Amino acid sequence: MYSSQASALPSRVIGLISGTSVDGIDAALVEITGTELDLKVELLAGKTYPYPAELRERILAVCAGEAISMLELADMDDAIALAFAQAAQNIQIGYQPVNLIGSHGQTVYHRPPKEAGVGKKTLGYTLQLGRGEMIAYLTGITTVSNFRVADIAVGGHGAPLVPRVDAFLLSHPHESRCIQNLGGIGNLAYIPARTDGWLSQIRGWDTGPSNSLLDLAVERLTAGAKTYDEDGQWAASGTPCYPLVEKWLTHEYFHLSPPKSTGRELFGVAYLNQCFQDAEPYQLSPADMLATLTELTVASIVHSYRTFLPQMPQRVFLCGGGSRNLYLKQRLQLALETIPVLTTDEAGVSADFKEAIAFAVLAHWRQLGIPGNLPTATGAPQEVLLGEIHQG
């Protein structure tokens, strides 16, 4: 149980996350009041702290399946925790005291649960590096970390975890909405209008690849000189190859019914290599290849909406790094026709730091004893408290 009196007091919380794009650590310092329907979050500061190049390369190699020793894994865990702690120390300058840190860490492995016969299920597994104990010690601030494992332990996917936060920050009394995150992997939260029973009707799942494939392709096409396509300008100069998009959409993941989750294990370097191999007969230019990969992201999102949502949303709000990709946004708007495609900035929540904000809120809820998962999104049979608390 939680104290309503304590929850009414403002709390300054830092949210930290590095997503599947491995661009760096997104840090958001927020002031939180309330809990759920009365939840109010003010962003005081937000910044992305790039990983050191050598550490980023090590993380990407592990995410791609490269085998490492336990010693190397331990060293990477410590290096990531140190980077997260430094981000927390930097973002709070001028805003002390800070009450709490919510640190997602860096996902290096994710395995969804699997059906193993009638009435049987093999539990999923997830590993986020950057241990909370070390962050709490280095910053002196109580830290909540390891958010996903509790949902997985009861049979859920441990993802997506953000839909419950989206529900209370971005829902509307009369309008159904999709909050579409365009990180390394795309994921959605479908939020119906706030009518009776609306919370039980929220849905969420990973739609498929987003920035991860595009960024990997840019690095490949430029021999590492560039890590992303700014504003999607390069892709915008190309022409999508629709037969390729149709071929790629036959991948079993896109036709798997939710709840579902994925990551670089499925849509990483090996998948991109196959995409390039598939494209060889078409003799695509680099711009055409990027345009076609962009179209895959768009097509997978629209396919998800039309196939698995109870109804199409009245508005779509984008967040994450891909929300700044103007070409991707334009293509998605074209595909969704009359449904307005906006960014969460236009609903009062930073599109750049929404995920970091969400983990600040999840940490706030954990400290107050409020469940953070939505079973309709993660597939868990019950609500659970998310995260492990490490005293600062």
Curated annotation (Swiss-Prot):
Top-level class of the enzyme under EC nomenclature: transferase
Name listed for the protein in its UniProt record: Anhydro-N-acetylmuramic acid kinase
Family of the protein in this entry: Belongs to the anhydro-N-acetylmuramic acid kinase family.
The entry's keywords: ATP-binding, Carbohydrate metabolism, Kinase, Nucleotide-binding, Transferase
Any one Gene Ontology molecular-function term assigned to this protein's record: kinase activity
Pathway participation: Amino-sugar metabolism; 1,6-anhydro-N-acetylmuramate degradation; Cell wall biogenesis; peptidoglycan recycling
Function of the protein: Catalyzes the specific phosphorylation of 1,6-anhydro-N-acetylmuramic acid (anhMurNAc) with the simultaneous cleavage of the 1,6-anhydro ring, generating MurNAc-6-P. Is required for the utilization of anhMurNAc either imported from the medium or derived from its own cell wall murein, and thus plays a role in cell wall recycling.
Residues annotated to bind ATP: 19-26
Enzyme Commission number, as recorded: 2.7.1.170
Record's keyword annotation contains Membrane: no
Annotated organism of origin: Trichormus variabilis (strain ATCC 29413 / PCC 7937)
